[in-house]
């Protein structure tokens, strides 16, 4: 456990005799504390203790003459040190935004990758969250997997990724965080009055021409959003070129 202050509970085989004393030790019997458990309390024990380091809890009964019954013992570990592993090179497999590292994507199903500063301990657990720490999922990354993390996640809306290590005692290391945007809604802007500057065919609007270099003109149904990109293809969509048309261009 990572918590020193505890409530110790136990069930006695019988109620204490009138002059019996219940004693508890948190340091393997080196010192004992008399508990105020009395005959009228029945067989259920509940008492406050404070653990220290790695040791054993002992519980015993001492009678009025000083005779001591057999102690029940339970080893414990108090660990209050959080894992110190950190994370670098956090990435998702399908970052479809304007930059390959902006964590803006249209794809919910992702592979999350990261590099750990050290291999995790045998009892440590790697955890991930896709909703800013609202819920955590234990990953099957093990000590033998080294420092390279690769795990499947499913993004939802706009939130923050968290990655952290939790040890066997429940201590939690510092989380690495990365905001992301999942946007699955396609732009609805349409185009009218599409034209080229030099249409040399039999009609000025038949798009037959003997001129390769053209100025393409069109009217958008609305101004593009601040982060939208207008793209143009001249080969039936096989390849696309980003245009410098901006929000203020109307």
Place the predicted regions along the sequence by residue.
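Flexible, low-complexity linkers/stalks enriched in Thr/Pro that connect modular domains
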Residues: 2, 72-95, 176-199
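Extracellular beta-sheet repeat scaffolds used for adhesion and glycan interaction
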Residues: 4-5, 9-58, 96-103, 108-162, ...
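Short, exposed coil/turn segments at beta-strand boundaries within extracellular/luminal domains
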Residues: 65-71, 169-175
């Amino acid at each position: 456990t990572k918590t020193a202050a505890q409530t110790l509970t136990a069930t006695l085989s019988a109620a204490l005799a009138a002059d019996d004393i219940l004693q508890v030790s948190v340091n393997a019997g080196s010192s004992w504390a008399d508990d105020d458990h009395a005959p009228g309390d029945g067989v259920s024990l509940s008492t406050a203790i404070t653990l220290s380091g790695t040791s054993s809890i002992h519980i015993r009964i001492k009678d009025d003459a000083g005779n001591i019954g057999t102690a029940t013992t339970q080893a414990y570990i108090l660990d209050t040190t959080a894992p110190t592993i950190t994370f670098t090179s956090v990435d998702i497999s399908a970052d479809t935004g304007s930059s390959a590292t902006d964590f803006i994507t249209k794809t919910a199903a992702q592979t999350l990758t990261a590099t750990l500063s050290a291999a995790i301990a045998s009892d440590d657990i790697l955890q991930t969250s896709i909703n800013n720490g609202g819920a955590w999922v234990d990953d099957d990354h093990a000590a033998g997997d080294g420092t390279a993390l690769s795990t499947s996640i499913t993004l939802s809306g706009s939130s923050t990724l968290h990655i952290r290590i939790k040890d066997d005692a429940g201590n939690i290391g510092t989380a690495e965080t990365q905001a992301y945007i999942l946007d699955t809604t396609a732009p609805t802007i349409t185009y009218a009055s599409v034209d080229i500057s030099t249409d040399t065919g039999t009609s000025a609007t038949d798009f037959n021409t003997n001129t390769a270099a053209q100025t393409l003109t069109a009217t958008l149904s609305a101004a593009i959003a601040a982060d939208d990109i207008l793209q143009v293809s001249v080969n039936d969509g096989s390849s696309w070129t980003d245009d410098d048309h901006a929000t203020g261009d109307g």
